[in-house]
Structure formats: structure tokens, C-alpha cells
Amino acid sequence: MALRLRHAALLAGLWLASGVAPAGGLQVSPVSLTLAASQNAEGLWLSNTGDNGVNAQVRVYRWTQEGAEDKLTPSRGLVISPPMLQLAAGDRQLVRAIRLGAPPSGPGAAQEAYRMIIDELPVDTAGKKGVQFVLRYSVPVFVEPAGAAAAPAQLSWAIRREGDKPMLEVANSGGTHAQLANLSFTDAAGHRTELTPGLLGYVLPGAQMRWALKPAAKVFAGGGTLETMVNGQTVQQKISLVDSPR
């Protein structure tokens, strides 16, 4: 059964600045993984910096993007070890993503994308009052193809008017994911509008994603320059508002 991944961008954005995912007593580091074609496994650390024990479950899903939405399906390419763990206060545990079979290969082979879903599970709270918060984290995992390096992300951009709502469309025809962050727009008169501080989201190879922008469509009517961080590098793109086909 497929899972929709609507919360992942928010979680990743919270982690982006520090490189560590905080969750009360539970911390995750690093917050993304990449397996080279020569690697069979890569790992991250789960740490408990709280005063009480933590139980966690770790699963992995194949991550694709269809119809401008993130989609998770059961993974046949990676497995997790260990999938269940208990961490006493002050403990940490290495959790590995292990590749099954060969990496992507062949002419034009692209990265494969996965998500590690880390759930903090309820613990025995007998005798304790208050609400127990149980959290979920989503960590991107990328598997590089064998042979020649995957083609870098190749992005095309558009801002489309849907009523008075502007929608940003980004398509990636390259073989590598694009992580988008810190989006801003500067109009022809030099007025700058911050659109998305922190992480906007990802565009996987061969996929197209769409995001609603908060300003009214008229802000973009005269065209201007879109600036964003793409995989940590500042990119500027001339852009104008277009009407969606009816």
C-alpha cells in the first residue's frame, strides 16, 4: 500500500540548519544518506539525550513523485538493521540501510530515492500524568548508479496563475535529485519578497513538483528573478507569470 508523504518537507526543513533532527530525547544524525554504487550499506545514529528510555521503529520505503506528490511504496531495494530498538537515557545506536542487489545501471541511469521513516513509539507511562507525544522523522536516502555519475539536476521553472493563486512548478530532467530551499522573488522594480525560508522540498529525477506560493499572483505579474538554493548552491532564474490552460 502506498503512503503519501505530506509532512516530510516540513520535518526536513526543521533539521536543515543543524544537521541533527531533535525529538525531545531522540536525535537523528545525519539527516540524509547517500550510498555510492560501491557501497552496500550506510548508517545513521539514533541518540537518546533525554532522561527516560526511548523505543523506536525504523522502516524504509521507495520514494517516487507522481502527479506532483510524494509517494512511498514498500521497498525491495533497501532493508533496515535493526528495525526495532530500545535506547536507555544517554545511549545511541547505529541503524543501517542495507542495499539489496545491484545499484541502478545502464545508459542514463539515475539516482534511486528512498525514505527512512523513524517512529518514536509509546513507552510505559504508568503513574505519569500528561499527554505523551510520539514523533515521526523522515530521512531521504539516495542510491547512486553504477558506472558514470548520474547527470546533474536539470531544472525548468514556471509560475502559473490559478485564479489569484500562483503555483510554482519545477521539473527535473536530470538524473540527480534537487533540494530546494530559501526561495525569494525580486520583481522588475527591485522589490524582494521572501517566499519560503528554509526547505521548500525536493524534485526527484524525471519528476515535476508544484507548490502554492503565498503572495497574490499580481506580485509576479511583471516578471522578475526567482532565487533559491539548489543542493546548497544559490541559483537565480528569470521568470514570469503565465496563465494555466483552461
Which role fits each region the language model picked out?
Residues E42-N48, A97-I98, Y114-D119, P166-N172:
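Buried hydrophobic-core signal for structured, non-transmembrane domains
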